[in-house]
Every structure is written in C-alpha cells, then in structure tokens.
Design a protein with these regions (language model features):
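Ser/Thr/Gly/Pro-rich low-complexity, disordered linker/stalk segments of secreted
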Residues: 1-15
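C-terminal amphipathic alpha-helix
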Residues: 12, 18-47, 51-54, 58-61, ...
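Mid-chain, structured segments of secreted extracytoplasmic proteins
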Residues: 62-99
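A short glycine-/small-residue-rich loop at the edge of a beta-strand within enzyme catalytic domains
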Residues: 82, 86, 107, 114
Length: 190
C-alpha cells in the first residue's frame, strides 16, 4: 500500500475517517499558539524599533487571536465565546500597555503589569469553568509562565541582550506546545 502525500500518520494513529479529530485539533492548537508567540514577538520588535510595519504585525496578532478563538468556538456556546473573546482581546491590549511601559521605563511595574497577570487568572478561571478537565491551578501556571517569558523577552530585548531574548523565546515555544496540548486534551475530554 502506498501512502498519499500528506497522509502519513504517527505511530498509534490511523487514517480512518473520524479517528484523526484529536490529531487535527492538536496540530491546529499547537500552530495557533506557536503563531501567537511568533507574531507577538515580531510585533513587539517592530513596536520597540518604531518600524513602519508594526501595524501589519499588530493586525496579524489580532487575526491569530481570531484563529485561536475559532478553535474553541467549536466546543463552547456563543455566550461563553463572547466572554472568552473579551478576555483574550484584553490580554492583547494589556500586552501593548506592558510593552509601552517597559519601552518608556525598563523598571516598569505599573498597573498594566498587574492587570496583565490578573487577566491571565481570569482566562484560566474561565477556561476551567467551561472545560472541567482543565485544572485551573495548572492552567494559571502555564499562563503565568507565558507572561513571565514574554516580559523577560521584552526586558532582554530592550537591554540589548539579544542572546537571552532568543533563548527565552525558544523556551517559550516549548511552553506554548505544552499549553496547546493541555488545552487540546481538555477539549477532547468534553
């Protein structure tokens, strides 16, 4: 039997119709979250350097947010999605405020920073209410780790420590894969 291009499977999976739902969801979730940190990274660099393309990068970040939200919309009712959309857009708005604060003052620790973490708590709480398989404490830690790494990258970049910035970004990729897999497992358990 020959395998058609693009239809290879990993060990333990099949190509039977309906059996790839988990694999497809996992791939989409991973790509969406990896794209999230990559697009935010490029946007922040363009913001810090005042590059002409920063609005294009910002638009891409918001388009990616729609992609992430669309994944959850397959599992959550419309009323829940309205709340999740509001929380996620607040996350992006606060990321902007934190970046602006750090750009103006490397020692920035203002209300936006505190609200950024509060928003992460709210997202973790919301998701764990919608998907009982999610452990809220574990999810909150993953979101905190994401914000910690995002902040550390911004600080390293603004300090001109590009090696550390890159190292943290590469670690953040693993964090996003773990987050995506955690989110996928919970959705599949619904």
């Amino acid at each position: 039997t020959t395998t058609q291009p693009g239809t290879a499977t990993r060990p333990g999976t099949t190509t039977q119709p309906g059996n790839n739902m988990g694999v497809d969801l996992r791939q989409r979730m991973r790509m969406a979250w990896l794209n999230h940190i990559t697009l935010v990274k490029f946007y922040l660099i363009s913001f810090f350097e005042n590059l002409s393309g920063q609005n294009a990068w910002k638009d891409a970040v918001y388009k990616n947010a729609e992609e992430i939200l669309a994944i959850f919309a397959q599992y959550y009712p419309a009323s829940a999605m309205q709340r999740f959309c509001k929380l996620f857009m607040e996350h992006l708005r606060l990321t902007d405020e934190v970046a602006a604060g750090l750009k103006a003052d490397p020692a920035f620790s203002g209300a936006a920073m505190e609200n950024w973490y509060i928003n992460a708590e709210e997202i973790a709480s919301f998701l764990s209410r919608q998907t009982p398989a999610y452990n809220e404490t574990e999810l909150r830690k993953m979101f905190y780790d994401h914000l910690d790494m995002e902040r550390q990258q911004m600080e390293a970049y603004l300090d001109g420590d590009y090696v550390t910035d890159i190292e943290i970004y590469l670690r953040s990729q693993q964090n996003m894969i773990e987050l995506a897999d955690f989110l996928t497992s919970g959705l599949l358990a619904r």
